[in-house]
């Protein structure tokens, strides 16, 4: 009787073990047979300029060319934001949302809707365009290069926003930033190099060096809480971190600024006070 019990027990145990082994092996076998393809699609917009000058006298607004550099269609969302890139600005962009087919160009128009701006200086806003992927099931949203491929595919779609400067310029402000870029003054202030802008223009730096050392235009340090990039606003000042090798040693500073057309000025030079 005891032998019969152990014999039956061994058969049941062997059967259960076989099931467990099969269940453990099944995912492994499946992972060996099925290949999951991964694709990545960017949804971005190329803007035909690096900055937009909006004259205060404009009644019809200003237009900007845009392009779809991808080989598949995208939706383009347009908006204007305040200098902080968060708050809405008193401008509209038409069309606010539109489809742009692969490799094609289009135009958007920026129109002021209100707002009270200083008359003695420029005001900075941001024109932002965002490429938007299709939703599941949208007929226009097929980005697959090989739709007949039977292998499962994980499609990573990345929506990218591109923002450029929109400079509202009063009629009283004449000329180009490069005409008065040599008016900037510089002085040492602790571990920082301070630049003062006495002009009505936003001075957008292309390059900056003190002595032979280049200054990192994107490194504002912990002192400057406003992440305003590589520019100094009108009638304002800002600080740059001084390279360690040149703290208080170099006496000359050199810089280039970007003009209204996105070009680069000649190099200016001044003595550090």
Curated annotation (Swiss-Prot):
GO terms for cellular component: outer membrane-bounded periplasmic space. One of its GO terms (molecular function) is protein folding chaperone. Residues 1-31 form the signal peptide. Keywords: Chaperone, Disulfide bond, Immunoglobulin domain, Periplasm, Signal. Disulfide bonds join 128-163. GO terms for biological process: cell wall organization; chaperone-mediated protein folding. Pfam families: PapD_C, PapD_N. InterPro entries: Ig-like_fold, PapD-like_sf, Periplasmic_pilus_chap, Pili_assmbl_chap_C_dom_sf, Pili_assmbl_chaperone_bac, Pili_assmbl_chaperone_C, Pili_assmbl_chaperone_CS, Pili_assmbl_chaperone_N. It is found in: Periplasm. Belongs to the periplasmic pilus chaperone family. Required for the biogenesis of the pH 6 antigen. This is Chaperone protein PsaB. It comes from Yersinia pestis.
